[in-house]
Amino acid sequence: RDVVAAVTNAGGYGVLGALAYEPERLEVELDWIDDHVDGKPYGVDFAMPAKYEGQGGGDKATPEYLASLIPEEHRAFADSLMEEAGIPEMPEDFDAAPKAAGLNVDLEGPGQVEVTLAHDNVNMVINALGPPPKYVVDECHQRDVLVGGLVGSRQHAERQLAIGTDVIIAQGTEAGGHCGDISTMVLVPQVVDAVGPDVPVLAAGGIQDGRQMAAAMALGAQGVWTGSMWLLAQEADMHPEVTENLLDATSTDFIRSRAMTGKPARQYRSAWVDAWEREDAPDTLPMPIQGLLFGEYSRRWSRVHSKEFGGHPAGQIVGSIDKVRPARDMVLDMVQGWIDVAEQFG
């Protein structure tokens, strides 16, 4: 939330990733942002997948039921990784609500949207992993709130338009988190051509300075969507070992893997990611079951601040960043860089 406020106050458009928040917690976060942006608009980003285990809700969508689907083979494999690394088990009295992309979408999604739309400063709701549910689009439009959608192909963009999405975010494979396999340079013009001149397109993936923003706009985008760069903003709430890994990384250290969520997502190549690439590793599980497994074990290594296992979804652009800086400076430098390129071309 601190990054959202800092970016917004610097003249950018901050967006809060709401995946991990139950409605009650989301209310707290949005209230805080409202109190720190002086009436400026910002957005909220969800990850409501088009396909996931437990879709439709009911008894077979509960975290307890989905966790019961984790095979013993997978737990044994994860246990062996922890034992080899000397990472202890969690205390017996430890209790935490399970979190994973694609979990509790049907149960908590309506409440998350209701909370979000009750905040007047929120003027866009964005969804990843497919078009948002129809009720999200309808409720947003009833309140004059824009709907944005991340896409990784021309076909994805067409499906977003069919459901009424207002802003298309063309996210290339360089991006952090869930992404496709088409590069930003190729994808953006394809999406711009597919949606036509009346639908704004934002470019995402491999963008963190003014040169890349200028290139994206030359491809037909009307702006850029940035994510991974903010992991290294001064205001970001990151574990120190993860920040250290990101600063030391090169662009080749960020690979697409299903090890974290069950769907292809670009992330730092931690020991957990490497392990699931091994020949003796079991197949990854579908979303959100793989995410539940990851969440269970990530609590263990986070508790002891394991640098070896300290990973995070992040894009290839992080390999170009070598220091932590205030978010305001990052915004202003990007704008100045764009101006410099524009002046070069007259």
Language model: regions and residue ranges:
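Active-site entrance/lid segments in N-terminal catalytic domains of soluble metabolic enzymes
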Residues: 1-198
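Conserved active-site-proximal phosphate/metal-binding subdomains
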Residues: 60-77, 181, 186-202, 208-346
